Every structure is written in C-alpha cells, then in structure tokens.
Amino acid sequence: MHQLVLLRHGESVWNKENLFTGWTDVELSPRGEEESRNAGLLLKEHGFVFDLAFTSLLKRAIKTLWIVLEQMDLMWIPEHKEWRLNERHYGALQGLNKAQTAQEYGDEQVKLWRRSYKVRPPALAEGDQRHPSFDPRYHSLSRDLLPDTECLQDTVERVLPFWQQQAVPALQQGKRILIAAHGNSLRGLIKYLDQIPDDDIVGLEIPTGSPLVYELDRDLKPVRRYYLETGKAG
C-alpha cells in the first residue's frame, strides 16, 4: 500500500480579505499558521512519517509545509518546490475583492470565472508587472509555459506532468509523500486520482490546513481516502 497525503495551505491573508490570489505571493494569516501547526501535530499524533515532500513556489504553501514538518520533527527530509503545483492563475482578477468584482461584472459572470471548468477570467494585459515572466522565480521557464490567466482545465493540465514525472516514480519507489499546495492544483490531482468528471470537480471544496490521506494500491489507484480530522471519506 502506498501513502500519499495532500494538504491545502493554511489560510492566507488574501483568503481572509476575500481577494483573488492566484500566483500572487502572499503570506499566511495568523489563523493559517495555526492551521498548519495543527495539521502537523495531527499527522504526528496519528503516526504519519514522510520520506519526501513537494510544494509550490508560493510562500503560503512553502511555509505551510515548513510548519508541518517542524511539528513532525521532519525538517530534514527532502523537499521539492514545483511551479506546476502553483495555484490557478486568475489573470486580471488577481488582487481584486471577490464581492466587489461580482458587483461590477455580475454574480453569474464571476461564478463562471470561478467555478466553470473551461472559462478563463480576463487575462493580464501585455506588460502587466504581475505577469510571472517579470518574476525571477520563473526566469528558468520558457515564456510559453507561463500563464496570463487560467481556467481549471488549464490548471489540471499543468499539474498532471508533475504527477507523472515526479510523484509517481517516488511512490513506486515506496516513498511516503506529502504534497502541500493550493485548492485548484490539488483539485487537479484529486480529479485524476478519483476520476471525477469535469462538471463535478468544480464544486469540490478542499478545506485549508486539513490533511487528505490517500491509501493507494500497487497500481496507484485509491483504495481509501479520508480527511484525517474526521476519518470520513472526502
């Protein structure tokens, strides 16, 4: 049996302020730090140990991982930062208040941008300093890999090469893996693992700071999945 734990980062300051975040690199809120500590303690209390960890290039996920590993006394294990685990890019909506955006564009339009599988929000304008091409952490990547906006389908397609090229080989070697990432990048992994239809995955809610445990068979097919806090199926 192979062990995989997925963890959405703790609450960020922009989660708290109800702003579209995407690839904007914001801090954890005090509540998010506490959620991360609790997740680490919970994993430790239940006897979980990891050989390898993955996270995104965004500090709310990185710090969540660090806090969890510190609580588990596992700061020494290898960790890999993968841009493909970044949150969905919300384009020109990044930094805008969700409620105010709904007032300006209408609830239905914003709902489409947020919750449809294939509809992208407005893209960043050419030359917008928020574009990842201006960020040094992405300078090693080809320009055509960097999004100016994404729908959920784009995010899923971005995440799957990470799964096939990084996670699968490690799991096949018997590594126990923790992935600390974001709501939409984790949706991509969950959609693939559980074979969830396009129309259903958009409504899947993933709580912040709650470890989602997968027990996988030799073919890496889920045998059991549950949130550690409750023991109930996710």
From Swiss-Prot:
Site (Transition state stabilizer): H182
Oligomer and partners: Homodimer.
Function summary: Catalyzes the interconversion of 2-phosphoglycerate and 3-phosphoglycerate.
Keyword Isomerase: yes
Pfam families: His_Phos_1
Family designation: Belongs to the phosphoglycerate mutase family. BPG-dependent PGAM subfamily.
Pathway assigned to this chain's UniProt record: Carbohydrate degradation; glycolysis; pyruvate from D-glyceraldehyde 3-phosphate: step 3/5
Gene3D superfamilies: Phosphoglycerate mutase-like
EC number: 5.4.2.11
Record organism: Citrifermentans bemidjiense (strain ATCC BAA-1014 / DSM 16622 / JCM 12645 / Bem)
Catalytic reactions of this protein: (2R)-2-phosphoglycerate = (2R)-3-phosphoglycerate
HAMAP family: PGAM_GpmA (MF_01039)
Positions with a binding annotation for substrate: 8-15, 21-22, 60, 87-90, 98, 114-115, 183-184
Any GO MF annotation of the entry: phosphoglycerate mutase activity
UniProt KW keywords: Gluconeogenesis, Glycolysis, Isomerase
GO biological process terms on file: gluconeogenesis; glycolytic process
Protein name per UniProt: 2,3-bisphosphoglycerate-dependent phosphoglycerate mutase
Catalytic-site annotation from UniProt: H9, E87
Gene from which the chain derives: gpmA
NCBIfam families (UniProt xref): pgm_1, PRK14115.1
Major enzyme class: isomerase
